[in-house]
C-alpha cells in the first residue's frame, strides 16, 4: 500500500471503515496502482479478500504485492485471499467441460447476461463459517475490472444489478467493503460503459479517478488523482467533498502533490 494515499484518505490498516463501496476509475491512463494499493491495504488490515481479477494473472499481482510488502501466495494459503483468475478460468470454461457451475459460467451461455454464478461464488467465499468466529476483520470484494465484463458481452444493466447484489450482501449484510475499477471512456461514444460508470458513481461512498495530464506526457508527473467523498447521510451542502492531486509512480511507492508543486517544477 502507499502511505501517502492512506494519509490523503485518512485511513490506516488498524482503522478501516466498513459498509463502503469505493469506485476506482481511470481515464486515458492506467489506474491499476489503485487496485494494488487497496489489495495490499486490506490484506495488511487482516480482512478476508475475494479478488475477482479479470485483467492480469495471479503472478503479476503477486510480484507487485511483494514490492508493497504483502505475499499473495501466503495470503491465499492461509485462506485470507480467494483469487479468481479470469484469464485462466475463462480458458477452462470455454474449452473444458465443467461438472459443477463455474463463477464465469456466463461465458458459455447465450446472451452472456447472467452473472448469478459469479455472485454465488462471491457470496459463498465471503460469508462467515458456521463453526466459531472468523479470524478476519471484515470481508472485502475487489474487482479488476468491471469494464471487462462489458467487453465479454454482459450488458451494463446486468453488471449494475450484479454490483447491487454484491453491495447488499458484502456492505450491508456482512458489514464489509467493495472496491471496483471501471474504465472512464471520457466522452467516447460508449453508451454501455457510461451507463455503468454513472450508475456506480451514484452508489459509491468514495470515488477515486485518475486521468492523464491535459498537457501530455511528463516524466516527473504521471497523472492526476481526484478524490470525491460522498456522504448521503449529511445535509445537501456537505454531501460531497473533493480534492485533486497530481502524482508520480515510483518502483515501490506513489508520491502525491498539489497541482504545479512537483519537485521538477519547483
From Swiss-Prot:
Compartment annotation: Cytoplasm; Nucleus
Xref: CDD domains: Elp6
Pathway(s) this gene product operates in, as recorded in its UniProt entry: tRNA modification; 5-methoxycarbonylmethyl-2-thiouridine-tRNA biosynthesis
A matching Pfam family: ELP6
GO CC, alphabetical: cytosol; elongator holoenzyme complex; nucleus
GO biological process, one term: retina development in camera-type eye
Quaternary assembly: Component of the elongator complex which consists of ELP1, ELP2, ELP3, ELP4, ELP5 and ELP6.
Family as reported in the entry's similarity comment: Belongs to the ELP6 family.
Protein name, as recorded: Elongator complex protein 6
Species per Swiss-Prot/TrEMBL record: Rattus norvegicus
Amino acid at each position: 500500500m502507499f502511505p501517502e494515499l492512506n494519509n490523503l484518505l485518512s485511513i490506516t490498516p488498524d482503522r478501516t471503515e466498513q459498509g463502503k463501496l469505493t469506485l476506482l476509475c481511470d481515464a486515458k491512463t492506467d489506474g491499476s496502482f489503485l487496485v494494488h494499493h487497496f489489495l495490499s491495504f486490506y490484506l495488511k488490515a487482516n480482512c478476508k479478500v475475494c479478488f475477482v481479477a479479470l485483467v492480469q494473472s495471479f503472478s503479476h499481482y503477486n510480484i507487485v504485492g511483494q514490492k508493497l510488502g504483502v505475499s499473495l501466495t501466503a495470503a491465499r494459503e492461509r485462506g485470507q485471499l480467494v483469487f479468481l483468475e479470469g484469464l485462466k478460468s475463462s480458458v477452462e470454461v470455454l474449452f473444458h467441460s465443467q461438472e459443477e457451475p463455474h463463477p464465469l459460467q456466463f461465458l458459455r451461455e447465450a446472451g452472456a447476461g447472467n452473472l448469478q454464478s459469479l455472485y454465488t461464488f462471491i457470496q459463498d467465499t465471503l460469508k462467515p463459517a458456521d463453526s466459531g468466529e472468523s479470524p478476519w476483520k471484515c470481508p472485502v470484494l475487489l474487482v479488476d475490472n468491471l469494464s471487462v465484463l462489458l467487453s465479454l458481452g454482459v450488458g451494463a444493466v446486468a453488471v449494475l444489478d450484479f454490483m447491487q447484489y454484491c453491495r447488499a450482501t458484502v456492505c450491508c449484510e456482512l458489514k464489509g467493503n467493495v472496491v471496483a475499477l471501471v474504465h472512464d471512456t471520457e466522452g467516447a461514444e460508449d453508451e454501455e460503459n457510461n451507463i455503468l460508470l454513472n450508475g456506480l458513481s451514484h452508489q459509491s461512498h468514495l470515488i477515486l479517478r485518475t486521468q492523464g495530464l491535459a498537457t501530455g506526457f511528463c516524466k516527473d508527473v504521471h497523472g492526476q488523482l481526484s478524490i470525491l467523498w460522498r456522504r448521503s447521510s449529511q445535509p445537501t451542502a456537505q454531501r460531497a467533498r473533493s480534492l485533486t492531486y497530481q502524482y508520480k509512480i515510483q518502483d515501490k511507492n506513489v508520491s502525491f502533490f498539489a497541482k504545479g508543486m512537483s519537485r521538477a517544477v519547483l
